[in-house]
């Protein structure tokens, strides 16, 4: 194996040791540290402008005398990617700082809102003026840059931010670790490490297979331990002071764990953490060498990945030893803690006490009416002299899973009444009198809501909610109206899904049983119809007459579009491309056009001459549906079922192209379609694997997949140009809209065939 080539600068060990750094691994820094600093300054400026909460004045960011944090943990990053990494890192720092200063309830709300902002499956509406929406704007622009630089790794990083950092940041937050292994597991899950590694991959442009990840995981585990413990070692004094002074409500440290579980003094606990850091670095090197010995022909890609993981450990260690974030406390006066003689001022709930920290054990801390209890993932329960308890954690709040109840309190009387009717013998004697005396009351909505609740709980791409948020950048619809519009769109969309599955005789919806399979056809139809009624009620009660007109007109268009889709399938009549696109404009595009028109009816924005969103929505509807047609034959099949459109006999875009341009395959396709059941009363049965394989082969041979992908790329380019035009007219960039398109981009779609 030849030596690895570097594009970063080596930092001599003696230079690093001047800051108190004791890492045993080599340290390197990116040659373009200026790019990282510029991105950090941009983040601080963007935060101040968008958030306006002054938090940027209270947070120590990635800057340090020895280099930017991102320059040290990503020293080998592709230069064009260093800036966005620094930007995201500073977002993480300020988000953590904000959470540490909140109660557990406030932190949970903060995490839940930001998770919703980044979660395409979330159906809740965001207040345009909320912190989550403002943060979403910051993240959208940055993530758009990431996706444009590397579509696959950029999307992976976005998923890590959303599904790992935010969704499980409170995992096991109520547990107290008793061993270092437990603590490291919790901190690895909750402390951002599962986000860091995708960021490192992105920095290098390295994609790893599952097998490659598994091969190097023991080495990465050692690196993770080194990263976490270095932060604990250098941040202990700062975090302790912040908790004691009331600046923070949580503390994250293995120092406390060792002091509590091993009965060590704080000084000895810090030394134990230091020894463990050195051991983790030794384990990293030993495991790396063992792997190289066992697999001497290991790829240069994996060698580079392992090497850069080690550089991240040493770079983080060096930065922690010198950065103001961890070391500014050293310049504090008595009012901020240490008085210069090893004494600290501690607030016990009744006032300040000055106590020595040297040889202060965890037991001594408890005797001073302050008890710091690690919860296992860096969180703590702070007990003061009054017995008040605040349970806090390292990074935010645990995500809650929605649960459906079989009966609500308002429905319980209905259940009890039925039971009493079953056992009341007096009814048998006085049927006429009892019936005449029953009071009139509204029945329970349990049965009617069940199919709706079921369909709304299914996974979703969340495109409509994202589009509402993005368009509101320009339309400035009040938050109350946005909530109503989001609710109405969700109701109508879910109702259409129930009816679509019935009309298509489809047993599956995104890999799950369709609503009518669970609740029956009649009950599902009734529920879907009521969802339409409820949606119109909400518009009539909460929005303007113009909004109601828009909803009713676009509902008509939805039904018209669906009528032709059903007609073609039942009569085995293939539409022309123009007819098919017109159907899309009404059936699929109608929902997008509806939300636009309703938002325009409620908009408070000043009218701009020439500002017209019609073409944007028209193109978006076509792009969305034709992409869905294409993906049904590809990896999207894992969610919807293998080529489900073929089971339904659907004339999708590839089929329309094939039949219009290659009549030699007409008999093949229509012959198979003719044999499928066309009415919902007939038990649905998917086409055989052999039949599907034959039809896919016909589409591949005639170039239908290439034509469809080419069409998508053309429409995507038109969409990008339309967004450019609208941004020029409004004078306001719309990163959320661009990110919405980027997530659906053809750049990340493989060519079928």
Curated annotation (Swiss-Prot):
Q: What is its EC number?
A: 4.2.3.-, 2.5.1.29
As its record notes, the protein acts as a catalyst of:
isopentenyl diphosphate + (2E,6E)-farnesyl diphosphate = (2E,6E,10E)-geranylgeranyl diphosphate + diphosphate
Task: Enumerate the residues binding Mg(2+) 4.
Answer: 500, 504
Name the Gene Ontology biological process terms.
alcohol biosynthetic process; isoprenoid biosynthetic process; mycotoxin biosynthetic process
Classification via Gene3D superfamilies: Farnesyl Diphosphate Synthase (1.10.600.10)
* Function (record text): Bifunctional terpene synthase; part of the gene cluster that mediates the biosynthesis of the mycotoxin fusaproliferin (FUP) that belongs to the class of bicyclic sesterterpenoids. The FUP biosynthetic pathway starts with the enzyme encoded by FUP1 that combines a C-terminal prenyltransferase domain responsible for the synthesis of geranylgeranyl diphosphate with the N-terminal terpene cyclase domain, to yield preterpestacin I. Preterpestacin I is then decorated by oxygenation steps that are catalyzed by two cytochrome P450 monooxygenases.
Q: Which GO molecular function entries does the Swiss-Prot or TrEMBL record give?
A: (2E,6E)-farnesyl diphosphate synthase activity; dimethylallyltranstransferase activity; lyase activity; metal ion binding
Q: Does the keyword Lyase apply?
A: yes
**Protein's recorded name:** Bifunctional terpene synthase FUP1
Q: Does the keyword Amino-acid biosynthesis apply?
A: no
């Amino acid at each position: 194996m030849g030596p690895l080539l570097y594009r970063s600068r080596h930092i001599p060990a003696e230079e690093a040791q001047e800051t108190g750094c004791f890492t045993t691994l080599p340290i390197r820094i990116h040659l373009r540290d200026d790019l990282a600093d510029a991105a950090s300054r941009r983040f601080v400026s963007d935060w101040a402008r968008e958030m306006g909460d002054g938090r940027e004045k209270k947070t120590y960011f990635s800057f340090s005398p020895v280099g930017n944090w991102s320059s040290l943990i990503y020293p080998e990053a592709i230069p064009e990617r260093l800036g966005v990494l620094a930007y995201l890192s500073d977002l993480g720092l300020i988000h953590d700082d904000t959470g540490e200063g909140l109660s557990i309830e406030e932190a949970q709300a903060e995490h839940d809102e930001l998770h919703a902002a980044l979660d395409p499956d979330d159906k809740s509406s965001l207040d345009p003026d909320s912190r989550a929406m403002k943060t979403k704007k910051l993240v959208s622009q940055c993530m758009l840059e990431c996706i444009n630089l590397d579509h696959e790794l950029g999307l992976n990083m976005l998923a890590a931010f959303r599904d790992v950092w935010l969704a499980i940041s409170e995992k096991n937050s109520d547990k107290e670790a008793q061993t270092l292994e437990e603590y490291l597991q919790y901190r690895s899950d909750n402390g951002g490490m599962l986000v860091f590694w995708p960021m490192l991959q992105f920095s290098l442009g390295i994609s790893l297979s599952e097998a490659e990840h598994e091969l190097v995981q023991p080495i990465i585990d050692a690196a993770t331990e080194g990263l976490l413990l270095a932060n604990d070692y250098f941040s202990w004094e700062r975090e302790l002071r912040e908790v004691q002074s009331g600046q923070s409500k949580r503390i994250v440290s293995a120092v406390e764990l060792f002091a509590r579980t091993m009965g060590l003094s704080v000084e000895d606990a810090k030394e134990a953490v230091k020894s463990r850091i050195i051991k983790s670095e030794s384990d990293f090197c030993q495991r790396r060498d063992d792997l190289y010995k066992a697999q001497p022909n290991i790829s240069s890609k994996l060698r580079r990945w392992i090497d850069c993981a080690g550089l991240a450990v040493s770079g983080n260690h060096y930065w922690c030893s010198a950065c103001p974030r961890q070391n500014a406390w050293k310049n504090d006066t008595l009012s901020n803690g240490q008085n210069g003689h090893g004494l600290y001022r501690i607030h016990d709930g009744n006032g300040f006490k000055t106590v020595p920290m040297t040889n202060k054990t965890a037991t001594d801390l408890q005797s001073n009416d302050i008890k710091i209890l690690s919860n296992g993932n860096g969180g703590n329960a702070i007990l003061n002299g009054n017995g008040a308890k605040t349970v806090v954690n390292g990074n935010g709040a645990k995500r809650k899973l929605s649960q459906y109840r079989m009966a609500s309190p308002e429905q319980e009387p209905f259940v009890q009444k039925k039971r009493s009717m079953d056992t009341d013998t007096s009814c048998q004697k006085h049927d006429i009198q009892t019936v005449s005396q029953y009071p009139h009351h509204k029945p329970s909505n349990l049965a009617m809501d069940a199919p709706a609740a079921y369909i709304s709980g299914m996974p979703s791409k969340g495109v409509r909610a994202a589009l509402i948020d993005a368009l509101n950048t320009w339309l400035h619809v009040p938050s109350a109206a946005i909530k109503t519009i989001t609710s109405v769109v969700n109701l109508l969309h879910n109702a259409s899904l129930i009816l679509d599955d019935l009309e298509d005789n489809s047993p599956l919806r995104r890999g799950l049983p369709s609503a009518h399979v669970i609740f029956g056809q009649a009950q599902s139809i009734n529920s879907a119809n009521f969802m339409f009624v409820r949606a119109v009620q909400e518009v009539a009660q909460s929005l303007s007459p113009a909004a109601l007109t828009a909803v009713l007109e676009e509902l008509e268009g939805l039904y018209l579009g669906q009528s032709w889709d059903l007609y073609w399938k039942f009569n085995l009549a293939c539409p022309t491309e123009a007819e098919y696109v017109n159907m899309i404009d009404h059936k699929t595009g109608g929902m997008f056009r509806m939300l636009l028109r309703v938002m325009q009816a409620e908009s408070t924005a000043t009218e701009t001459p020439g500002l017209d969103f019609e073409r944007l929505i028209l193109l978006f509807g076509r792009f969305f549906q034709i992409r869905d047609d294409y993906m049904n034959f590809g990896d999207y099949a894992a969610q919807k079922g293998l080529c489900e459109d073929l089971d339904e006999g659907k004339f999708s875009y590839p089929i329309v192209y094939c039949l219009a341009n290659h009549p030699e395959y007409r008999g093949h396709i229509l012959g198979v379609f003719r044999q499928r059941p066309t009415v919902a009363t007939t038990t649905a049965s998917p086409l055989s694997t052999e039949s599907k394989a034959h039809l896919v082969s016909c589409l591949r041979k005639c170039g239908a997949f290439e034509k469809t992908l080419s069409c998508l790329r053309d429409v995507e380019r038109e969409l990008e140009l339309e967004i450019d035009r609208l941004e020029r007219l409004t004078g306001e960039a719309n990163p959320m809209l661009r990110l919405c398109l980027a997530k659906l981009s053809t750049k990340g779609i493989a060519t079928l065939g």
